[in-house]
């Protein structure tokens, strides 16, 4: 028995191994065709089929369609004329709800999209964010296919902003447009998203503007002309508003005959513009008027002597413009002081400067001796080129160059009172640089 059992054991193992061997797999059945490609007889019948193969194919198709990426139901889709259009169907041509969708599915999608855009109808989706483009412009380039909310009462509400006098939007809740504050212009116009405050309280038509004060003239009309021209009047100067400060022109459009013209003093320093000896001329106060020679005439009888004859024509009355420049620069105590304003008393940015401009400007103590005209004397420094050429310096006591007391620059213009004009010309002619004019 034991030998027989030992002899039959390998046979049992062999049978078990042969029974456990895997069988080759059967080929998978081909996928069933979609319902749209079924025969007409099967599609036309409304009764459910009891064929197991048909039921299996139907279930496989539903499983494939529902497990896909979009889980879309194939057509046809219901047409419901009284309902709004299905936006997903208009965009993609498919609908995951199939025949159970409660929206309209028009056959011609392009025609439906075009008609919706013509009517200006946009979808209202309460749970979605609002379409920002629709809020700004009142339109939407996506039309009914846009996935955002389009409230009808807010159409273009973001674009309805108030404009300032220059046509730029006023947005107090936004930051100020830096480019507009510097230049007074904005290339984006009324579409800029920043704030554009008013630069002026009044335009050029306003006479009480703090930036452009009113101009008063002491004479409104000149004497009648002896020729064929009738009596003429001097026109009032017109000023163009600008974000920067502009000094009004001191020259009015007029016809000036040969003679002397009385203009306001050009001296901006505390002292005399051109110091001369007390024996030849009198010192003038800073507010006194000075004579401006329009032409130098050489007398024919005294031409060989090299002397310039005095002016024979009487002084011609010219309108005097009294300008009172107020402090138009902004005071910002919480900002640092404008260094240019503290040095010169002026600021090219005017009312739009972002720094502080105190009314009482503390002048720094000069570190050198000042000349009679209020300019610094720095013997060891380089000569101020602007002062050597024109006799003035816009930096005043703050200039870092030397301003020695010197004779005025030689030219056709001479400054001084009417009584001291001839002695001044004599002194200029005696200088070596005037030899060319006397030869």
Swiss-Prot record:
Source taxon at top rank: Eukaryota
Organism the protein comes from: Oryza sativa subsp. japonica
Compartmental location: Nucleus
Nucleus as UniProt keyword: yes
Main location per the UniProt record: nucleus
Disordered: annotated span: 1-52, 277-306
Identification of the protein by name: Zinc finger CCCH domain-containing protein 12
Compositional bias segments (type: Pro residues): 22-37
Pfam families: zf-CCCH
Listed InterPro entries: Plant_ZF_CCCH (IPR050974), Znf_CCCH (IPR000571), Znf_CCCH_sf (IPR036855)
Gene Ontology molecular-function annotations: DNA binding; mRNA binding; zinc ion binding
CC terms in the record's Gene Ontology section: nucleus
Keyword Transcription: no
Biased composition (Low complexity): 7-21
Matching SMART domains: ZnF_C3H1
Zinc finger (C3H1-type): 80-108, 125-153, 171-199, 332-360, 378-406
Record keywords, A-Z: DNA-binding, Metal-binding, Nucleus, Repeat, Zinc, Zinc-finger
């Amino acid at each position: 028995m034991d030998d027989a059992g030992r002899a039959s054991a390998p046979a049992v193992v062999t049978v078990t191994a042969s029974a456990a061997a895997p069988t080759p797999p059967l080929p998978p059945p081909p996928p069933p065709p979609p319902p749209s490609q079924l025969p007409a007889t099967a599609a036309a019948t409304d009764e459910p089929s009891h064929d197991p193969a048909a039921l299996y194919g139907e279930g496989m198709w539903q499983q494939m369609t529902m497990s896909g990426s979009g889980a879309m139901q194939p057509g046809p889709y219901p047409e419901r004329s009284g309902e709004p259009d299905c936006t997903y169907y208009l965009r993609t041509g498919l609908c995951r709800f199939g025949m159970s969708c409660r929206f309209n599915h028009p056959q011609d999608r392009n025609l439906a999209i075009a008609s919706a855009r013509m009517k200006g109808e946009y979808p209202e989706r309460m749970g979605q964010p609002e379409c920002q483009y629709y809020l700004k412009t009142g339109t939407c380039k996506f039309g009914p296919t846009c996935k955002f909310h389009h409230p009808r009462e807010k159409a273009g509400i973001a674009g309805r902003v108030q404009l300032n006098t220059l046509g730029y939007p006023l947005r107090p809740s936004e930051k100020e447009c830096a480019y507009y504050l510097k230049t007074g212009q904005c290339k984006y116009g009324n579409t800029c998203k920043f704030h554009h405050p008013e630069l002026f309280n009044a335009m050029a038509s306003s006479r009480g503007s703090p930036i452009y004060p009113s101009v008063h003239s002491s004479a409104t009309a000149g004497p009648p002309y002896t020729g064929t021209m009738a009596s003429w009047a001097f026109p009032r100067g017109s000023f163009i508003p600008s974000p920067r400060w502009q000094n009004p022109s001191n020259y009015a459009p007029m016809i000036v005959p040969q003679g002397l013209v009385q203009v306001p003093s050009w001296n901006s320093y505390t002292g005399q513009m051109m110091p001369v000896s007390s024996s030849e001329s009198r010192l003038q106060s800073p507010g006194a008027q000075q004579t401006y020679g329009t032409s130098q005439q050489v007398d024919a009888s005294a031409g060989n002597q090299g002397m310039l004859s005095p002016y024979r024509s009487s002084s011609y009355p010219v309108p005097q413009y009294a300008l009172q420049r107020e402090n138009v620069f902004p005071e910002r105590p919480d900002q640092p002081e404008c260094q240019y304003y503290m040095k010169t008393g002026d600021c090219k940015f005017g009312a739009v400067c972002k720094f502080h401009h105190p009314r009482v400007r503390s002048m720094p103590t000069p570190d050198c001796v000042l000349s009679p005209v209020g300019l610094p004397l720095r013997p060891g420094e380089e000569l101020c080129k602007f002062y050597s050429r024109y006799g003035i310096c816009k930096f005043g006591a703050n200039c870092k160059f030397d301003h020695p007391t010197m004779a005025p620059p030689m030219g056709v213009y001479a400054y001084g009172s009417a009584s001291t004009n001839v002695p001044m010309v004599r002194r200029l002619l005696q200088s070596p640089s005037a030899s060319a004019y006397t030869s």
